[in-house]
Amino acid sequence: MVWNTNLRWRLPVTCLLLQVALVVLFGVFVRYDMDADPHWIDKKEAENSTSDMENEFYYRYPSFQDVHVMIFVGFGFLMTFLQRYGYSSVGFNFLLAAFGIQWALLLQGWFHSYYRGYIRVGVENLINADFCVGSVCVAFGAVLGKVSPVQLLIMTLFQVTLFSVNEFILLNLLEVKDAGGSMTIHTFGAYFGLTVTWILYRPGLHQSKERQSSVYHSDLFAMIGTLFLWMYWPSFNSAVSNHGDAQHRAAINTYCSLAACVLTSVALSSALHKKGKLDMVHIQNATLAGGVAVGTAAEMMLMPYGSLIVGFICGIVSTLGFVYLTPFLESRLRVQDTCGIHNLHGIPGIIGAIVGAVTASCANTDVYGVNGLTQAFGFDGFKTNRTPSMQGKFQAAGLFVSLAMALVGGIIVGIILKLPFWGQPADENCFEDAIYWEMPEEPKSTVLHPEDSTLKPSEP
């Protein structure tokens, strides 16, 4: 089938309509929160909170910076491994994230910070909006190279909506703990994206197989994304934790899990190659799986050795997934997972949910202390009668809710994106920047390098 990929009207109209709608909605509903609005100074004085240094900005902004870099630089560059899709990997990630954070501020605001007729926005809202967009970036990895920017905007519109509903169910109704988003961000984002790409299955994708591979410099750019993600993941998992020991624990647990994951990923990558060589795909992706898997239990008393075990297991599972599971999914289940998000986010997200459920079930006053247990899991108010074993069951329920929302939502959104007027590329043109970008002319070299006798001058 021949597709019309000309976006001259479709993309501008879609972008402008969405942005104008957001401007109107922000004007009607969004206002600054107490820490950003001088009108609340009297209330602060009544609460003896008059020091500017007590403003939430100074507690949260460093973490916000780190998370923001992960979303726009980390995820963007991680997907530049495709040899002729670098512009689109970074550029489309930039586009969907910029739209997604605005839409997320509205939807999450209606669910979590709606007060006296307005959504109150502060720095913590910005972090949560980035988390929401992180889930979209995960799903983007599954459809990378096979969809148009208009399709990505439509997918973001629906996914942010579904994410916000799922997050509200888990955090507000089930009261689960998921500081680093193993369930809400990674599991939901991965299986949503995998379901969408399953619906959008392309039987003729083999025609673009040559462009689906990497070259030396594209892998190097992708490794930059990996390093940014790896360095800032402790901030990601601890960004919205309660101040004090919980936030401190989240950073330590993530740090340890990531470190262990690198060694096992390298070990497995070498062991699985017949000549003992390393595969850059494994090093770019599997080394991050420990950060995903420790997310749910990040605030809990997992202990540093427990975090090392989680990272150790995920390095093995993720690397094996890239070697064996990804080809199986494509050949048998018609799931064309471009970036292998099932191995980096899907399976590690499920492992993280299980680790969180088990760790919560095993919690006791000997480990946390009486007040510490109450504070760590919020066993007060209407949760006074909840026990650690009950909390573990709610944690497990949260995993199934996330999976159900991802699968059902992915099917619906996939069907919408399959409509023929979104400007998607033909099978033979997938993974190609030139379809949507003005490309610079590549200069023809006429210089002979004497040290290499095989080189010939370019044809005129």
Curated annotation (Swiss-Prot):
Residues 31-61, 112-125, 175-179, 241-251, 307, 361-396 are extracellular. Keywords: Ammonia transport, Cell membrane, Glycoprotein, Membrane, Transmembrane, Transmembrane helix, Transport. InterPro entries: Ammonium/urea_transptr, NH4_transpt_AmtB-like_dom, RhesusRHD. It catalyses: NH4(+)(in) = NH4(+)(out); methylamine(out) = methylamine(in); CO2(out) = CO2(in). Ammonium transporter involved in the maintenance of acid-base homeostasis. Transports ammonium and its related derivative methylammonium across the plasma membrane of epithelial cells likely contributing to renal transepithelial ammonia transport and ammonia metabolism. Postulated to primarily mediate an electroneutral bidirectional transport of NH3 ammonia species according to a mechanism that implies interaction of an NH4(+) ion with acidic residues of the pore entry followed by dissociation of NH4(+) into NH3 and H(+). The keyword Transport applies. The chain crosses the membrane at residues 10-30, 62-82, 91-111, 126-145, 152-174, 180-200, 220-240, 252-272, 286-306, 308-328, 340-360, 397-417. It comes from Canis lupus familiaris. It holds the Pfam family Ammonium_transp. One of its GO terms (molecular function) is ammonium channel activity. Gene3D superfamilies: Ammonium transporter AmtB like domains. This is Ammonium transporter Rh type C. Residues 1-9, 83-90, 146-151, 201-219, 273-285, 329-339, 418-460 are cytoplasmic. SUPFAM superfamilies: Ammonium transporter. Its main location: membrane. It is a multi-pass membrane protein. It is found in: Apical cell membrane. Belongs to the ammonium transporter (TC 2.A.49) family. Rh subfamily. One of its GO terms (cellular component) is plasma membrane. N-glycosylated. Homotrimer.
